[in-house]
């Protein structure tokens, strides 16, 4: 168990190095390998193996904390990588950011990335929700402010069109 945690940590660090080098596909591969090392160790997730008989020893609280930290960092870093790769898979960015926010609801980077994903998925209300939370944590971040402004603009445009539609129907 300890060995798998260490291997996951090594893969995560290799992913971080690849990210810094701009090798996003390689980084994604390393983060996925790290997560694969952790598969089945997380007691908070159901495991199909539990019905097959006794499991190995339970994780200590410290090991569980290490596991969750590695998972959270990998998911956050996966979202960052995917935003750098063309074409961007915004659905995956949303999914990975949400996994981070389940454990760290105040994570400003995950809030921003989720907001960007929701914006591009045209879910402007949820984009606004996440971007407002991000701007509250990082008020000087120009990227967060820019996406919040774009989202507000899209929402205003949507509401104007909706109003015109209803005026035409009931006017």
Curated annotation (Swiss-Prot):
**Alphabetized UniProt keyword annotations:** Repeat, TPR repeat
PROSITE patterns, sorted? TPR, TPR_REGION
- Pfam hit, one: TPR_19
- Each TPR repeat occupies one of these ranges, namely 8-41, 72-107, 108-141
Task: Read off the InterPro entries from this record.
Answer: AIP/AIPL1/TTC9, TPR-like_helical_dom_sf, TPR_rpt
Q: Which family does it belong to?
A: Belongs to the TTC9 family.
- Protein name as catalogued: Tetratricopeptide repeat protein 9C
Source organism of the structure? Mus musculus (Mouse)
């Amino acid at each position: 168990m300890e060995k798998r945690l260490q291997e996951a940590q090594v893969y995560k660090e290799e992913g971080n190095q690849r990210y810094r080098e701009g090798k996003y596909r390689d980084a994604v591969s390393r983060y996925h390998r790290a997560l694969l090392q952790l598969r089945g160790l997380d007691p908070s997730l159901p495991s199909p193996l539990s019905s097959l008989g006794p499991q190995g020893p339970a994780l200590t609280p410290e090991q569980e904390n290490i596991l969750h930290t590695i998972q959270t960092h990998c998911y956050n870093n996966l979202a960052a990588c995917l935003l750098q790769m063309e074409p961007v898979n915004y659905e995956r960015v949303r999914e990975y950011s949400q996994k981070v926010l389940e454990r760290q609801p105040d994570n400003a980077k995950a809030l921003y990335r989720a907001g960007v994903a929701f914006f591009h998925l045209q879910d402007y209300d949820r984009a606004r929700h996440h971007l407002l939370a991000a701007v509250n944590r990082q008020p000087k971040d120009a990227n967060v402010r820019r996406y919040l402004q774009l989202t507000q603009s899209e929402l205003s445009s949507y509401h104007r069109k909706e109003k015109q539609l209803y005026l035409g129907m009931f006017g």
